[in-house]
Each structure stands twice: as structure tokens, then as C-alpha cells.
Amino acid sequence: MLFEKQEYKNRLSKVKSAMEKKGIDLLVSQDPANMNYLTGYDAWSFYYAQCVLVHINEDEPICFLRAQDVGGAYIKTYLQDKNIIKYDEKYIHTWPLHPYQYLVEIIKKRKWDKSNIGLEMDSHYFTAFCYETIKTGLPNAKLKDAERL
């Protein structure tokens, strides 16, 4: 890790404070710079779906990554192993499967599917398909723009 764990906790606290002000319960952050800021994860794996989830009531963020990329998260982040979630290679280039379908299931399993969810709507790596998968898969959630949070 480039910084002490406390530095990441301080950053997380600032982000949660901004989330609270915007009425966001769950942040889905896809921007590689923001993922790094929150967790220390800095691998060049952003060419395919990945994100960090920040829930207002959780102590740590969750890294959601492709299976072949989680090794970097174990090394570069301060996160507990349980907060590094991998998706299977079956979601890679196998239309109609997509990693965000699995992400939606994770959100439902944690009972966050009725939350106010912040999305980085202007993030280069957040595609229209990712958005539609979340919107369709979580019909009871309120989706908000969390850009420049």
C-alpha cells in the first residue's frame, strides 16, 4: 500500500460525508482514479467492468473485479478478503452475460436493492449497457448521478 490504512479510512469518511449530503446510500465507483483513491487498487485492468462499492453503513468498500485481476487487489489494497469480490470469466465476451448482472445480484443479496444508488454517470468506463443493467436489475433503487462527488 502506498498509504497507511488510516489515510484510506479518512478518505472513505470524506466520501461518505459527501454521499450523505447528496442522499446516496450506495456509491458505485467505476473511475480507476476514484477506485485507487478509495482502496489503493491501481492495476491496469479497467478495460473491462470493475468498480468499488461504498455503502454508507459499511466500514470498508468492496472491490468488484474480474477473477484474473483480484490478485492485485489482495496485494495493493487494505481491504479484507471478504470485501474483494471476483466475477467469473464466463461473464467476459459471452453475450448476453455481463459482469454487471452479477453485480446486481450482489447488491440484491446484501439487501441494498431499494437504496439511493450513486453512479459516476460521466465515467469513461461506465457504459450505457452497465447503466441499463443496473436500472433494469434494480427497479426499486433510485439512481442518482454521483459524478464529482
Residue ranges and their predicted role:
Residues M1-L149:
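A composition/biophysics-driven feature that prefers long, compositionally simple stretches
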